[in-house]
């Protein structure tokens, strides 16, 4: 279930963060979410999962989630406790996979430092950075917000089916 606004501490990454560094290929044979969580961002920040706290936010540059179209990448981030990903842009397949697994995200070009506490308002399409202002991002369409609110595509479809039965 999506929380809004999302307030959390920033983990900052650059451009072209590919799915191979988000979750290295050697972990793809498992379906154990704890293994995904334990190795999230390992390819670029080996200490990430030891230091990240539930509710933290990843802020990145352009083309976040590029590379192979592995659904495990947003799952690893989500199960590591990351509440949201904000990036200048996302690889399209990562963007949809994140929505489908219920990982909130927003395209926005914001100024912040690692460790800053920021507020992401998905409903308004804004990111508030104390001392730097409010940055306007790309607000998600309502149908994608509905999927996130329901916890991902599978939960969203189950909810719709249950409503049809009533």
Swiss-Prot record:
<protein>
    <recommendedName>
        <fullName>Methanogen homoaconitase small subunit 1</fullName>
        <ecNumber>4.2.1.114</ecNumber>
    </recommendedName>
</protein>
<comment type="pathway">
    <text>Organic acid metabolism; 2-oxosuberate biosynthesis.</text>
</comment>
<dbReference type="GO" id="GO:0004409">
    <property type="term" value="F:homoaconitate hydratase activity"/>
</dbReference>
<comment type="subunit">
    <text>Heterotetramer of 2 HacA and 2 HacB proteins.</text>
</comment>
<keyword id="KW-0456">Lyase</keyword>
<dbReference type="Pfam" id="PF00694">
    <property type="entry name" value="Aconitase_C"/>
</dbReference>
<feature type="site" description="Critical for substrate specificity">
    <location>
        <position position="29"/>
    </location>
</feature>
<dbReference type="InterPro" id="IPR015928">
    <property type="entry name" value="Aconitase/3IPM_dehydase_swvl"/>
</dbReference>
<feature type="short sequence motif" description="YLRT">
    <location>
        <begin position="27"/>
        <end position="30"/>
    </location>
</feature>
<comment type="similarity">
    <text>Belongs to the LeuD family. LeuD type 2 subfamily.</text>
</comment>
<dbReference type="GO" id="GO:0019298">
    <property type="term" value="P:coenzyme B biosynthetic process"/>
</dbReference>
<dbReference type="InterPro" id="IPR033940">
    <property type="entry name" value="IPMI_Swivel"/>
</dbReference>
<dbReference type="InterPro" id="IPR050075">
    <property type="entry name" value="LeuD"/>
</dbReference>
<dbReference type="InterPro" id="IPR011827">
    <property type="entry name" value="LeuD_type2/HacB/DmdB"/>
</dbReference>
<dbReference type="InterPro" id="IPR000573">
    <property type="entry name" value="AconitaseA/IPMdHydase_ssu_swvl"/>
</dbReference>
<comment type="function">
    <text>Component of a hydro-lyase with broad substrate specificity for cis-unsaturated tricarboxylic acids. Catalyzes both the reversible dehydration of (R)-homocitrate ((R)-2-hydroxybutane-1,2,4-tricarboxylate) to produce cis-homoaconitate ((Z)-but-1-ene-1,2,4-tricarboxylate), and its hydration to homoisocitrate ((1R,2S)-1-hydroxybutane-1,2,4-tricarboxylate). Is also able to hydrate the analogous longer chain substrates cis-homo(2)-aconitate, cis-homo(3)-aconitate. These reactions are part of the biosynthesis pathway of coenzyme B.</text>
</comment>
